[in-house]
Amino acid sequence: MYPRRAAARWIEGYVLLEFTVTKTGAVRDPKVLEAKPPGIFDRAALNASLKFKYKPKVVNGEPIEVSGVRNRITFELTDA
């Protein structure tokens, strides 16, 4: 969800996150690596990442956890 304050001021930006993808494909321990502008979209990006679902990596027929996964979330406004 776009932060209300940022939307009202037409602020756009991005957040680069790093997290672990669990054996079930869920996101665990997301953290902000980089954000522009800093502090504006961090919470929204962290909350969104916890809803992500990945297909877990499989090794020898078994799902495994993968740490250090990165995802950049971009926040852009459009004229609707």
Regions found by a protein language model. Name each.
Residues 1-8:
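Short, basic/aromatic recognition patches
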Residues 8, 38-39:
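Loop/turn elements at beta-strand to alpha-helix junctions within RNA-recognition modules
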Residues 22-34, 43-56, 66-80:
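Conserved "boundary/linchpin" sites in short secondary-structure elements
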Residues 16, 64:
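Short, flexible micro-motifs
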Residues 10-15:
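Short, small/polar residue-rich loop motifs at catalytic or cofactor-binding pockets
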